[in-house]
């Protein structure tokens, strides 16, 4: 359901995985159901946006069309309940600081760790000033059920158009985000490339 919003032609159905004795079977009705798998159309990984960008094979018109498609999905996406905690100023701040904690655990060469600490301190000091804006966006309905993992490797050229796929299904907190944050992930990835 979630990924068909972005790529209805890529997602076929959900297959049952069963255990039949010592064997796992996909799509079988025999045995105990142990899991489910999403069945998708197989596409050429060379058509993923990261590979296309690397080869210089992306046209501005394609990116414009992708932006229009994502905006259309966002405009129809379910708004997150303001009482759910999704998109609350406290949660946005915590996610921001958690990202810095994860990055600080990486073995990065200097001056990156020093710069990350400076940026983290700035973000922590600036967060209280941004909290009213975050609250305003929450109340205005900009926190919605988004893609949640929108980056170049999760976009493919399929049937001559760029199409987002592989959105977050396993964790509602990662997909119930501000629509601006959803598109920002892809924008930053494109800018970095």
Q: What are these regions, as identified by a protein language model?
A:
Residues 3-7, 18, 42-47:
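Generic hydrophobic/packing signal
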């Amino acid at each position: 359901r979630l990924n068909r919003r972005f790529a209805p032609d890529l997602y076929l159905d959900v297959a049952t995985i069963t255990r039949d004795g010592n064997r796992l079977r996909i799509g079988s009705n025999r045995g105990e159901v142990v899991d489910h798998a999403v069945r998708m159309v197989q596409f050429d990984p060379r058509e993923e946006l990261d590979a296309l960008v690397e080869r210089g094979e992306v046209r501005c018109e394609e990116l414009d069309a992708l932006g229009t498609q994502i905006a259309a999905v966002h405009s129809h996406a379910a708004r997150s309940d303001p009482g759910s905690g999704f998109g609350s100023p406290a949660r946005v701040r915590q996610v921001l600081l958690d990202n810095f904690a994860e990055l600080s655990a990486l073995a990065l060469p200097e001056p990156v760790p020093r710069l990350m600490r400076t940026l983290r301190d700035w973000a922590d000091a600036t967060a209280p000033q941004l909290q009213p804006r975050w609250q305003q966006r929450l109340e205005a309905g900009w926190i919605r059920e988004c893609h949640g993992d929108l980056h170049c490797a999760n976009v493919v050229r399929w049937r001559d158009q760029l199409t987002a796929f592989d959105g977050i299904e396993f964790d509602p907190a990662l997909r119930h985000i501000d629509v601006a944050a959803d598109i920002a992930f892809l924008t930053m990835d494109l800018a970095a490339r």
